[in-house]
């Protein structure tokens, strides 16, 4: 045993300039090293050769290695050996792994050991790396401090591997840079020659130290341009460790340590490393399992899940074997619910948390994004199971909305013409055992609330229990509770086409040989249950208000289905009249709710088939329904009381009234509906524009001013449509002058409401008013110039592309125009244009003519006072801008701009005492 107190006293007398805590003030490094070395030589009992021999024996270096280290050749080598021996002596005589009082050391002494270790790692590791490492800014400072010595580096590596076992040294990440330098040193030696000691050193760093730090350091090294041998070695280390346990998770963690890179970028980097064609199939399969385990672990962390899901998708795309493996793993997620091993009454198969976690995992895997998740066609076989789970979950649970998103993603990505109808047909017929078979809940399984009402349990029910699969109730309920209205419309059209086929198909079933009640029940179910489910589903969906708005955009498909149905009914008299009657009632509800469908060409083509159906059918209810439909198509229909109470129709009816106060009340209702984003109102955007333009012609100012407010609200829903319609109306030569002037006011109000977004439509707005300023109608021309002046101010004077044309219009009006109010407005435009000139030098050839014109107008006492006032304002603006320009020019002593690089060919003038801050240093 040695007296460790003397060694701590020795460390206290040294100054560690390269320790992490002292790097901010490391001037005089060479002097500090020399001073430290003298102190070590003074108090060391052993000669340096004996210290070296003792270290080589302890760390398993051969005699050849020892002989290749010459301490006398370099003072730095001597310093490395002596400092290493001091730390080795402390490590050997203090049991850092013991909690006994006699083995504990003070925090100050532990800090000395850490600083000495950091100093030693700088000289013994960082200063002896492969020359290519010094291309990196993190290592370049250590280049040329010492000539690299293979044996000395190997000795230092062995020393630090033993030192890193002491966990107290790792406090506050004190060994982070030591581990980085150690890994770089190991790789540098591996390039020169292989050694079992180096393999063990890398294995230790991977197994016992932070795996995330290992990957981070490897990626840090690879960021530098290295020689092929070194680059390949690092690449092999990266890929080799990646396929070891926890490799994928550690790689993601390493990239997430950088807060400046977003999660999507990190995910792309990870996926490009993980999903490579060069990996063996076995390695790819192991990686798939790793990634899935990672996703399960980080379910609640969306940022980290992004990397896992994207990597899994890239692995899925690599090979058919990977696809098969992923499909098998996905099936095992629900095997307990589809094919439970034990079916014992009351047995709990899955608790609340497990079920919610599995649903959340699938949401991440399939709904995280459009490109980074697994393909949605994998979900098709699980649709029955997912719909049953959705039906069993309480609506207030997050898992309910999550599983809803999964189902919606699957259905929405299916092709509408063939694929989606085929899926819906298989669901409603419940032919899930046909090839390819689909998965569903075991008939004995039931989802019930647990003792805690906010949680659920999946249990085995009584043997007489049958799992519910009422698609006519479950699927429409899911669709109408979501905001995915376009998908609701697709499903509605598919189901409508499906029921049309069911009505047209003659049933092959016969009642002649039914001999029992069970057979009768099966016959009735097979003949009528499917049609009943379809009608219930359609009835539930057609009552969904947003669906009608969507159907107005799919008029052609809807009416094509109905036309085929009517053609078949006119040929076949034995079709079920009750089903046809329900379909006709559905059509009437849709037509009553959408005027666009009533006016479509396809709807008018139905008239012939409806006439034929009405004359051939003996059913009075069908005849009455046909009569009502023909009335709607002919345009003689008036809204029913049920339709009138709908918010949009009520607002529209009020606007169409003759009394001003009723119109304004209807306008306010319409504005409120637009603010609430009412789906039925938004779907009638073009109709609202037409209604507003008609109301704008009202002579009552109370009405048309409120109508302008309606345009202001409407612009938030359909910007370009509103501006295009208003511009066309403003420039219409056939419209009344007062109406055109009001439209101009509406355009300005709409532009004000758009604010900065108005810049996107400046071409439409400016061209509209510039065209109007050429009108032969004096009042209209004056209005156009006034609107131009206000528009220039709204656009923050960003009218450079139109500047010359605007000046020509103003000049033409002032020289040839005879209407004084128009001239006033033209001078106002000129003043506003001067206000918008950011740099007068860009328009210097026009400044003198503008100045002379404004000066002449202001000086002419016979001129209109308002014109003189506008001209005076323009001159003030011009004077202010010219003064500012001249002042800035005087400050620079030249109107020419100069770019001067300070410090190059500068004459140091003694007069320049107050130098610029960039010239300091």
From Swiss-Prot:
It is found in: Cytoplasm; Golgi apparatus. Keywords: Cytoplasm, Golgi apparatus. This is Transport and Golgi organization protein 6. Belongs to the Tango6 family. The lineage of its organism: Eukaryota, Metazoa, Ecdysozoa, Arthropoda, Hexapoda. GO terms for cellular component: cytosol; Golgi apparatus. May be involved in protein secretion and Golgi organization. It comes from the Eukaryota. It holds the Pfam family RTP1_C2. GO terms for biological process: Golgi organization; protein secretion.
């Amino acid at each position: 045993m040695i007296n460790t107190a003397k060694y701590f006293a020795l460390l206290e007398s040294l100054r560690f300039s390269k320790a992490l805590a002292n790097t901010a003030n490391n001037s005089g490094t060479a002097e500090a090293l020399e001073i430290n070395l003298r102190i070590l030589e003074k108090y060391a009992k052993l000669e340096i050769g004996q210290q070296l021999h003792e270290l080589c024996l302890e760390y398993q270096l051969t005699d050849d290695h020892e002989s290749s280290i010459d301490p006398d050749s370099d003072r730095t080598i001597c310093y490395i050996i002596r400092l290493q021996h001091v730390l080795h002596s402390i490590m050997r005589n203090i049991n850092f792994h013991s909690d006994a009082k006699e083995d504990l050391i003070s925090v100050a002494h532990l800090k000395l050991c850490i600083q000495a270790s950091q100093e030693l790692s700088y000289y013994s590791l960082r200063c002896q790396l492969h020359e290519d490492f010094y291309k990196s800014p993190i290592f370049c400072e250590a280049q040329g401090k010492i000539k690299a010595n293979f044996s000395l580096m190997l000795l230092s590596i062995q020393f630090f591997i033993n030192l890193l076992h002491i966990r107290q040294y790792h406090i506050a990440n004190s060994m982070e840079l030591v581990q980085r330098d150690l890994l770089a040193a190991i790789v540098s030696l591996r390039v020169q020659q292989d050694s079992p000691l180096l393999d063990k050193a890398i294995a230790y760093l991977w197994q016992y130290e932070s795996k995330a730090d290992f990957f981070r350091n490897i990626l840090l090294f690879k960021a530098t341009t290295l020689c092929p041998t070194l680059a390949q070695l690092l690449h092999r280390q990266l890929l080799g460790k990646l396929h070891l346990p926890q490799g994928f998770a550690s790689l993601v963690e390493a990239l997430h340590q950088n807060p400046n890179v977003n999660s999507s970028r990190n995910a792309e980097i990870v996926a490009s490393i993980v999903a490579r064609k060069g990996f063996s199939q076995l390695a790819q399969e192991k990686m798939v399992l790793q990634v899935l385990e990672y996703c399960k672990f980080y379910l609640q962390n969306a940022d980290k899940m992004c990397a896992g899901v994207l990597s899994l998708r890239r692995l899925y795309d690599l090979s058919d074997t990977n696809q098969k493996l992923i499909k098998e793993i996905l099936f095992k997620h629900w095997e307990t619910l589809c094919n439970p091993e034990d079916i014992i009454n009351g047995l709990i198969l899955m608790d609340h948390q497990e079920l919610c976690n599995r649903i959340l995992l699938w949401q991440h895997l399939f709904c995280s994004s459009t490109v980074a998740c697994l393909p949605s066609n994998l979900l098709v076989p699980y649709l029955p199971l997912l719909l049953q789970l959705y039906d069993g979950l309480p609506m207030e649970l997050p898992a309910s909305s999550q599983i809803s998103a999964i189902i919606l993603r699957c259905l929405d990505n299916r092709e509408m013409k063939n694929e989606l109808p085929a899926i819906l047909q298989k669901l409603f017929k419940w032919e899930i055992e046909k090839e390819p078979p689909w998965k569903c809940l075991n008939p004995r399984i039931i989802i019930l609330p647990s003792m805690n009402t906010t949680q659920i349990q999946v249990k085995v029910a009584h043997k007489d229990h049958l799992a519910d699969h009422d698609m006519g109730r479950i699927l429409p309920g899911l669709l109408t509770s979501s905001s995915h209205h376009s998908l609701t419309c697709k499903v509605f059209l598919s189901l409508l086409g499906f029921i049309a086929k069911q009505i047209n198909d003659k049933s092959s079933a016969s009642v002649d040989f039914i001999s029992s009640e069970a057979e009768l029940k099966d016959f009735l179910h097979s003949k009528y249950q499917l049609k009943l489910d379809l009608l219930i589903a359609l009835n539930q969906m057609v009552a969904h208000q947003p669906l009608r708005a969507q159907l107005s955009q799919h008029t052609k498909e809807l009416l094509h289905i109905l036309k085929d149905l009517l053609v078949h009914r006119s040929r076949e008299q034995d079709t079920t009249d009750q089903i046809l009657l329900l379909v006709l009632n559905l059509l009437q509800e849709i037509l009553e709710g959408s005027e666009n469908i009533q006016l479509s060409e396809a709807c008018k083509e139905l008239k012939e088939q409806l006439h034929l159906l009405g004359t051939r059918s003996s059913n009075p209810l069908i005849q009455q329904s046909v009569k009502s439909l023909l009335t709607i198509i002919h345009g003689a229909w008036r809204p029913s009381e049920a339709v009138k109470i709908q918010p949009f129709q009520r607002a529209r009816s009020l606007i169409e009234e003759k009394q001003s106060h009723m119109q304004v009340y209807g306008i306010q209702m319409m504005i409120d509906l637009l603010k609430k984003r009412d789906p039925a109102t938004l779907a009638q955007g073009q109709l609202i524009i037409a209604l507003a333009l008609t109301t704008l012609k009202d002579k009552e100012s109370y009405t048309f001013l409120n109508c302008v407010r309606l345009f202001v609200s409407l612009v938030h829903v359909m910007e370009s449509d509103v501006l295009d319609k208003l511009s066309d109306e403003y420039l219409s030569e056939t419209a009344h002058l007062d109406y055109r002037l009001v439209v101009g006011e509406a355009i300005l109000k709409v532009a004000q409401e758009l604010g900065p977004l108005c810049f996107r439509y400046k071409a439409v707005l400016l061209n509209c008013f510039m065209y109007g300023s050429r009108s032969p109608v004096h009042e209209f021309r004056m209005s156009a110039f006034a609107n131009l002046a206000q528009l220039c101010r709204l656009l923050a004077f960003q009218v450079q592309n139109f500047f010359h044309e605007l000046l020509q219009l103003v000049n033409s009006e002032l020289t040839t125009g005879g209407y004084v109010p128009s001239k006033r407005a033209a001078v106002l435009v000129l003043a506003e244009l001067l206000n918008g000139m950011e740099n007068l030098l860009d328009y210097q050839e026009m400044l003198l003519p503008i100045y002379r014109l404004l000066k002449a107008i202001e000086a002419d006492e016979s001129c209109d006072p308002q014109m003189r006032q506008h001209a005076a304002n323009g001159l003030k603006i011009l004077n202010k801008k010219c003064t500012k320009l001249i002042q800035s020019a005087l400050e620079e002593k030249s109107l020419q701009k100069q770019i001067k690089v300070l410090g190059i060919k500068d004459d140091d003038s003694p007069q320049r005492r107050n130098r610029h801050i960039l010239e300091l240093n």
